[in-house]
Amino acid sequence: RLTVGFDYQHFGGKSWNKKVATGEHIPGVDKQMDEFAGYVDFRQDLGDWLSLNAGIRVDHHSHVGTEWIPQGGLSFHLPEQMEMKAMVSKGLRNPTIRERYMFPPQNPDLRAESLMNYELSFSQRALDGALFYGINLYYIDGDNMIMTVPTDGKPKNINTGEIENWGVESNISYRITSCWQIN
């Protein structure tokens, strides 16, 4: 299976404050930002027991620049309706107009946040498909995280550096009837 797509987002507008007493308009922000992205996602079964998933996205932001965002994974289809998956993906979040240009914490020099995500999961269907359960282990390594921090006694949005996050997720669901299911 091959999926190809394109995204376009336009952000912008004009802001101002109006003094109630005098009616005076005080100019605020008049900014525009555009984001273009093209992507390709590919999934291929390699026999009955293995699937390959791969994708790439190129994201261009009018103020931040261009970034390549890859992802890839393998799915192992095991006996007894069990499945194991391994995945690696990159994530990206561009700064918003508010974070860059509006209100006292604004900072026009912000860079995009970047994440690398690693996942390993196991799942199984049982009881003729009525029962489904799974567990997912993940690790996230992030850089350039945007936070509001005091700078010279005033709040300012800055790229603060690195983060690490890891954890375990689990899920279980049971289909009681064709109309009822509990999770």
Predicted feature locations:
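Feature captures outer-membrane beta-barrel proteins of Gram-negative bacteria and organelles
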Residues: 1, 27, 35-45, 67-77, ...
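Face-selective signature of the C-terminal outer-membrane beta-barrel domain
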Residues: 1-64, 77-79, 131-137, 183
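Residue-level detector of conserved, well-ordered beta-strand and adjacent loop positions
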Residues: 5, 98, 111
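Transmembrane beta-barrel architecture of outer-membrane proteins
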Residues: 8-14, 30-38, 58-70, 88-92, ...
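Outer-membrane beta-barrel translocator domains and adjoining extracellular loop/strand segments
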Residues: 14-23, 64-70, 97-103, 145-153
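A structural preference for long, well-packed, hydrophobic secondary-structure segments
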Residues: 18, 33, 50-52, 66-69, ...
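Extracellular loop and loop/strand-boundary signature of outer-membrane beta-barrel proteins
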Residues: 21-29, 55-60, 102-108, 153-159, ...
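Membrane-embedded beta-barrel scaffold of Gram-negative outer-membrane proteins
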Residues: 77, 83-85, 112-166, 171-182
